[in-house]
Amino acid sequence: MANVPWAEVCEKFQAALALSRVELHKNPEKEPYKSKYSARALLEEVKALLGPAPEDEDERPEAEDGPGAGDHALGLPAEVVEPEGPVAQRAVRLAVIEFHLGVNHIDTEELSAGEEHLVKCLRLLRRYRLSHDCISLCIQAQNNLGILWSEREEIETAQAYLESSEALYNQYMKEVGSPPLDPTERFLPEEEKLTEQERSKRFEKVYTHNLYYLAQVYQHLEMFEKAAHYCHSTLKRQLEHNAYHPIEWAINAATLSQFYINKLCFMEARHCLSAANVIFGQTGKISATEDTPEAEGEVPELYHQRKGEIARCWIKYCLTLMQNAQLSMQDNIGELDLDKQSELRALRKKELDEEESIRKKAVQFGTGELCDAISAVEEKVSYLRPLDFEEARELFLLGQHYVFEAKEFFQIDGYVTDHIEVVQDHSALFKVLAFFETDMERRCKMHKRRIAMLEPLTVDLNPQYYLLVNRQIQFEIAHAYYDMMDLKVAIADRLRDPDSHIVKKINNLNKSALKYYQLFLDSLRDPNKVFPEHIGEDVLRPAMLAKFRVARLYGKIITADPKKELENLATSLEHYKFIVDYCEKHPEAAQEIEVELELSKEMVSLLPTKMERFRTKMALT
């Protein structure tokens, strides 16, 4: 190296970095890694010019550097040791080169070689990893090894590297605290060294990446609480350091909302979704960064897709909040329990007094104007369970707004499954809104809207390719007709003398419900059209419910023909008996339909007597 000016070595290194940043699509189609290979060649030249690694660092067995190798590898160092003297300085510069070679090989899908270089980097830094000069490089190397092992699906190994990085960061901030040297500064002239502010920004970004990768690892390990905590920390830090991609940040915040929704933490979910809306609105207003080299305006399809995905998260929020309220207020037959409603009203003030101040501190994104913008979105949406129709309607309208927004991208032509799920959510919004409605005619109209949006899907779908989805839709349409029939019967019961139009309407609804329940049950038959002796666990409850409702529907058909009525009662009895007999042969099924089974047993006992009386009456007339 004595014969080569240091400035030339630095130029080679900077040229290698520039080539490393060239995007793949800018390379020739047949040589997508051309720039990466050119960068690698320059890095190897710099490595050769630096000379061999210090002997005691280079000769140590690699096994010592693996995860779990004790204090000298991933454990925390006992003290801060700065790399002083020419030998130590050369070791650190070589570590920088090994790091970039490692990343280069990973980028070209040569994982084993990439791992080897990253492990060499860590070995060279072993003594100095907590120092001002080396901490950032050490954490970056371990982060990349964490990603590498994660890609190999060795998640526990990835976890060890990433948790070690987190611990190193925390120890450094506690014991040293000053912004550390960025690895690239090893090859910069003194006058081009970074400011303290820029160093701090880069180091905090490295740590933010560490938290982001840990969130992914914990999610993979099904440690969902931890994953949510790290995801939230990542998102918060990205905003604090103004280092985020609006579309990516927004979709991550919306995804985090789903964790809170499943935990029934609706205030936190609302905050995440409101923040997602605000940040997503920045798309195109923020210039590209080194992390996001292309302006977002160049990816309109991704923009519209993410917008649709965020809309779907809002739909889930509205739907789950309404359904949770329904569960809290319904009686044992699924109707509104006024006593429960009154109890929840009494709790409302207490909820407002206690939760607003406590929980708002737990999840909060942004400060100043950003915080105000997020709050402005939040204030338009309730996080409390709706207790009456007006409150439920507000959530319904918000959910429906996002249904229309989601359907703009997720159209049936190209996104069949997604489109159907959005339509099913729309139907579910109408269904749960009907629970809060006291006017039975208006409830009927809501179920009619559900049928109007679901029935066309059964025409568009090929049952051979979309069997499960078809079953879901058939069952849901049947249930909507079933609910409408029950409501029409209740309306007729209030009249002294129902006219023929109402009777015809009830029978038509009955017939439609039977049609779709039968289509659902027929879909369970084998290719020889034989109904299974053992019904699969995934469809057991819906199959039993369908049988029970078919039995009940036959018993509800209104006819003036005694012979036809007797036939209907016999068919009804046949379906009730099926349920009882099946549960006797398969006791596990009884747990799925306890209420329906008891009613079926009762009907199996009562119907034969009723039918016998009917026969006697027919004989006498």
UniProtKB/Swiss-Prot annotation:
Residues 51-75 are annotated as: Disordered. The keyword Transferase does not apply. Disulfide bonds: none annotated. Keywords: Cytoplasm, Cytoskeleton, Developmental protein, Differentiation, Hirschsprung disease, Neurogenesis, Phosphoprotein. It is found in: Cytoplasm, Cytoskeleton. One of its GO terms (biological process) is microtubule cytoskeleton organization. Gene3D superfamilies: Tetratricopeptide repeat domain (1.25.40.10). Highly expressed in heart, brain, ovary, testis, spinal cord and all specific brain regions examined. Moderate expressed at intermediate level in all other adult tissues examined, as well as in fetal liver and brain. Not expressed in blood leukocytes. The modification Phosphoserine is found at residue 178. InterPro entries: KBP (IPR022083), TPR-like_helical_dom_sf (IPR011990). It is linked to Goldberg-Shprintzen syndrome: A disorder characterized by intellectual disability, microcephaly, and dysmorphic facial features. Most patients also have Hirschsprung disease. Interacts with KIF1B; positively regulates KIF1B microtubule motor activity. Interacts with STMN2. Activator of KIF1B plus-end-directed microtubule motor activity. Required for organization of axonal microtubules, and axonal outgrowth and maintenance during peripheral and central nervous system development. Belongs to the KIF-binding protein family. This is KIF-binding protein. It comes from Homo sapiens (Human). The lineage of its organism: Eukaryota, Metazoa, Chordata, Craniata, Vertebrata. The gene is KIFBP.
